[in-house]
């Protein structure tokens, strides 16, 4: 839906901008965390608007954690991009077979399409790097796609969680 698109673009742009400023000037941790949690709050409320307050609170923490998790994992050539591509392709293809979840597929496959050309240049030996701006954006986007998927169908939320396990286990 257009509203979900605005949430992804607005929140993604904000966290990417903070990541870019952090790459350039080394921002204080409290400021980065504040922006990540503020963006996560808006996204969680927007994507899970009918959910109980406890679920939204947990979603905010989970989304903020996903942003930091992906940023933390970024360091090896091709690692984050390949894992994110796997999550997006897996969720995108599986959601094609779930009635009413075509939007989940679209949002997941958009990131997959963006990651493929990036990976061409990020594959070892890397000639192009995502930095904090790219890593936090990918973390935010992956987290939002997971929340959106869970909001559309609980089974898709479980699929997203399973596909994210390489990030979780490696942390």
Regions found by a protein language model. Give the residues of each.
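"…together with the soluble PPM/PP2C metallo-phosphatase catalytic core" -> "…together
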Residues: 1-168
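Divalent-cation-assisted or electrostatically stabilized phosphate/pyrophosphate-binding catalytic cores
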Residues: 171
